[in-house]
């Protein structure tokens, strides 16, 4: 079932320096909660400056949904320590509140209780809040409070030059973009390994169902928790953060121009369903527009091609200008066993898997096959640890046992690990392979199995509160390592100044400005 990458691995072993200079970044979302686990109703902590313009700490959907962002980094340890510093400083500056350590929220009875993220009075800031108003009215606020970790990854120019020859200009844009689309297609075909190993949302609080019927065969504990005994990541299921209305958009990942055209089409395509919401009611704007996507970021995807945008530039226009610069992996649940929601083992595994995805052959993928890959993902998401579980290839009928496919994949990853260790020194990547491959013979070692044992004992709420309290105490006590207190103070002041400058620079009323941007 795994493509034959022996030739590509032999090539890599002859060109190990092609992997020197991998760049990555991390983003981690977490809800601010009170000591009893309920959602914090306070505004964004003052010490964190402006959520609109802060370089490292912002908010996602809700005012209480923090998002931490590391700069691009070539050093894993440095990146994780930087992320930890962001958590340490925040933990000391959020009063008695804690950071919720799980992807799935609990103790939120009503979506109406959730305040949308606020970004001030600039047109850009108001636009961001209006976008969130649209998300709330389309999908419900509760779904938007699900948290995850995003891992951004780029291969060094040396890799592309070793693979494609001496490339530059338009040629480089085309070939590098084609290479990243290969990564994306392989990710859709084999990325289910991520929720298998690291999924950590096998259960949900009853409030999350909000009385809606579900066809999933949930088991229920006395404290009202619903769980599937072999589930890995309900966050990635239809109960979690997905968008069914997008499933027939026909966006494909074979070609840069085709992908961008599909994305731009979705932004222009009217939606009957969202038209029913209306655009305005009693003088209050309800969404940016009633198209299938209000803006490009609304496209739900487990992985995205990206390029850093210039001021006023849309993500797709940035891709057209310069091609794909990096990949954003979006399938990671919050790691409840780490105070910062992600750990070194996961980052090293993702490095290995992304390199493998860049090496393995990846035939073009029709929108039909893309839909078929969802079958494997859903199996792993809902019953990944079930004994005897099998997976298919694309839309074919042949089935293969998941543990065997996983072990075959890791046989390849081990060779990638040897190459990465040879240029970085030590055996850190090989050690990660040895630790994780054991999860295929013993699913009890996976994150989902480990966290479910705790949740069955103490419920999601009890588990979340215990971890949140422990991490709060730990992070508040730890000294900063990379950043200093004065760095945070300077960035707070600079971010507030940047927001004020944006507000002062606006010349048009929001309604006029919006007509040009909606």
Swiss-Prot record:
Pathway: Sulfur metabolism; glutathione biosynthesis; glutathione from L-cysteine and L-glutamate: step 1/2. One of its GO terms (biological process) is glutathione biosynthetic process. It comes from the Bacteria. InterPro entries: Gln_synth/guanido_kin_cat_dom (IPR014746), Glu_cys_ligase (IPR007370), Glut_cys_ligase (IPR006334). Its EC number is 6.3.2.2. GO terms for cellular component: cytosol. It holds the Pfam family Glu_cys_ligase. Disulfide bonds: none annotated. GO terms for molecular function: ATP binding; glutamate-cysteine ligase activity; metal ion binding. It catalyses: L-cysteine + L-glutamate + ATP = gamma-L-glutamyl-L-cysteine + ADP + phosphate + H(+). NCBIfam families: glu_cys_ligase. Belongs to the glutamate--cysteine ligase type 1 family. Type 1 subfamily. This is Glutamate--cysteine ligase. It comes from Escherichia coli O127:H6 (strain E2348/69 / EPEC).
């Amino acid at each position: 079932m795994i493509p034959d990458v022996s030739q590509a691995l032999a090539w890599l072993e002859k060109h190990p320096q092609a992997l020197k200079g991998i760049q990555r970044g991390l983003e981690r979302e977490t809800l601010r909660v009170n000591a009893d686990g309920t959602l914090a109703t306070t505004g964004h902590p003052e010490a964190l400056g402006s959520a609109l313009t802060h370089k490292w700490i912002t908010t996602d959907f809700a005012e209480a949904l923090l998002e931490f962002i590391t700069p691009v980094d070539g050093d894993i340890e440095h990146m994780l320590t930087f992320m930890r510093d962001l958590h340490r400083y925040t933990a000391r500056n959020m009063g008695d509140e804690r950071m919720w350590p799980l992807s799935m929220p609990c103790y939120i009875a009503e979506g109406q209780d959730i305040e949308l993220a606020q970004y001030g009075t600039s047109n850009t800031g108001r636009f961001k809040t209006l976008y969130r108003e649209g998300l709330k009215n389309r999908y419900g606020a509760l779904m938007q409070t699900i948290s995850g970790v995003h891992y951004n990854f780029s291969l060094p120019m040396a890799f592309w030059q070793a693979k494609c020859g001496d490339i530059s200009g338009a040629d480089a844009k085309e070939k590098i973009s084609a290479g990243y689309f290969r990564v994306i297609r392989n990710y859709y075909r084999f990325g289910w390994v991520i929720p298998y190993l690291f999924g950590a949302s096998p259960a949900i609080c009853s409030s999350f169902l909000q009385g809606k019927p579900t066809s999933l065969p949930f088991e229920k504990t006395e404290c009202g928790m619903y769980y599937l005994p072999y589930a890995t990541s309900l966050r990635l299921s239809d109960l979690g953060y997905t968008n069914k209305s997008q499933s027939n958009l026909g966006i494909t990942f074979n070609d840069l121009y085709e992908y961008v055209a599909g994305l731009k089409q979705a932004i222009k395509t009217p939606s009957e369903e969202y038209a029913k919401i209306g655009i305005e009611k009693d003088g209050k704007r309800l969404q940016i527009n009633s198209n299938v996507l209000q803006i490009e970021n609304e496209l739900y995807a487990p992985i995205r091609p990206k390029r850093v945008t210039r001021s006023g530039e849309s993500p797709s226009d940035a891709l057209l200008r310069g091609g794909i610069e990096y990949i954003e992996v979006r399938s990671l649940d919050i790691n409840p066993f780490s105070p910062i929601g992600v750990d070194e083992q996961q980052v090293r595994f993702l490095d290995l898997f992304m390199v493998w995805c860049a090496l393995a052959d990846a035939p073009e993928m029709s929108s039909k096959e893309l839909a078929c890959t969802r079958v494997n993902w859903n199996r792993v998401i809902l019953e990944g640890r079930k004994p005897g579980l099998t997976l298919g290839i694309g839309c074919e009928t042949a089935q293969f046992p998941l543990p065997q496919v996983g072990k075959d994949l890791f046989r390849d990853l081990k060779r990638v690990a040897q190459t990465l260790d040879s240029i970085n020194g030590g055996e850190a990547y090989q050690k990660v392979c040895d630790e994780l491959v054991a999860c295929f013979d013993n699913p009890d070692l996976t994150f989902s199995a480990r966290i479910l044992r705790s949740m069955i004992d103490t419920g999601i709420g009890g588990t979340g509160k215990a971890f949140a309290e422990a991490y709060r105490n730990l992070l508040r006590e730890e000294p900063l390592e990379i950043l200093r207190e004065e760095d945070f103070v300077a960035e707070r002041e600079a971010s507030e100044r940047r927001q004020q400058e944006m507000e002062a620079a606006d010349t048009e009323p929001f309604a006029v400005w919006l007509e040009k941007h909606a």
